[in-house]
Regions:
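N-terminal secretory/membrane-targeting segments
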Residues: 1-109, 131-152, 185-190, 194
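Solvent-exposed soluble domains appended to multi-pass membrane proteins
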Residues: 92-108, 115-322
């Protein structure tokens, strides 16, 4: 029986080498027409079958251990955090409730509405490089900056991968340690894990998410509960919303105005059901690609009136106002 066992083991090893060394290589998958569907796993399995879907996802599961990673190294970082707490900083708003009330006497907990505005950025920052517009392209943002605390955040993702940004924002974990091509919501958020919503629930918060696209995209419908989000209002549950900019993959993108109505409505529903403080995670869609010129009406376009020498006029002929 030993020869049979040895033969079976050799066959299994050769099969694994063929699958992981050849079949699952990106170039090979592309050559034979396998295009991993990072957006909807159920659709991917329907197109290519259980074996291909399982095997290609398997390649995205293993996370390499970082250099110098150990329990002692983590404890050293925590010691530094404890040491930093000895230093005091002045409150941003000296007359606020948190600044004027001792921590052990504080009973109020703020409403937290966490909005991730799809692809939004302050286009007016281009003016420092010599690009001038015929109007203030970030008028609403500039108005908010006059009355609110604000800062700068750098997105960990560019040109796609919305769920990567969400994952980092909600958990504080970096996707840079994950295998290339993996998506945390699909391969790694498969059971309850520490995240901002789950932590806030221990502090007495009620939690929900609002996103104006299909619930199954990026597997949000299964990932959100594991992050501590108890309710999820997706496009399937939205009625009478306004849409703009049709594409081949959608009948239109829900506008930010309609999204604001959905956020307000969900907040009011949660407050009517309970006196507990609210955490609401919202992700918009209006600014999503594609940015075809014919998808924007004339009254949404602004003109570039000057640009740096060497930059073609056609390159920066028209921009759409994010206001």
């Amino acid at each position: 029986w030993l020869p049979r066992v040895a033969g079976s083991a050799a066959t299994a090893a050769a099969l694994c080498l063929l699958i992981f060394g050849v079949y699952l290589q990106p170039a090979v998958c592309q050559a034979i027409g396998i295009v991993p569907d990072a957006w909807m796993q159920d659709r991917y399995y329907r197109y290519y079958g259980v074996v291909t879907g399982f095997m290609t996802n398997l390649a995205n599961l293993e996370i390499d251990k970082p250099d110098n990673y150990s329990e002692e190294a983590v404890d050293a970082i925590l010691d530094n955090v404890d040491e930093s707490r000895k230093f005091s900083t002045s409150p941003l708003y000296p007359t606020s409730y948190a600044a004027t009330t001792a921590k052990d006497e504080q009973v109020k907990k703020p409403t937290i509405i966490y909005v991730m505005n799809e692809s939004y950025w302050d286009v007016s920052e281009l003016e420092q490089y010599g690009i001038k517009f015929d109007t203030d392209v970030s008028a609403n943002l500039h108005a908010l900056q006059q009355t609110s605390a604000y800062g700068r955040a750098y997105s960990p993702s560019f040109g796609g991968g919305t769920c990567d940004v969400e994952f980092e924002a909600l958990t504080g974990y970096s996707v840079s340690f994950l295998p290339s091509g993996s998506k945390p919501y699909q391969q790694h958020v498969t059971k309850p894990m520490f995240a901002l919503p789950s932590y806030l629930k221990t502090e007495g918060y009620q939690t929900a998410a609002v996103h104006c696209f299909w619930a199954r995209y990026w597997s949000r419908d299964t990932a959100y509960p594991n992050l501590g989000l108890d309710d999820f209002i997706s496009l399937e549950k939205m009625h009478g919303v306004q849409k703009v900019r049709r594409h081949y993959w959608t009948t239109g993108l829900v506008t930010d105005d309609s999204m604001a109505d959905q956020i307000i409505g969900q907040y009011e529903t949660m407050k009517a059901q309970s006196d507990a403080p609210v955490f609401l995670h919202a992700v918009t869609m209006q600014n999503h690609t594609n940015y075809n010129r014919d998808n924007y009406p004339d009254d949404e376009r602004v003109h570039v009136v000057s640009h740096p020498v060497g930059l073609k006029s056609s390159t920066c002929l028209l921009y759409t106002s994010p206001s």
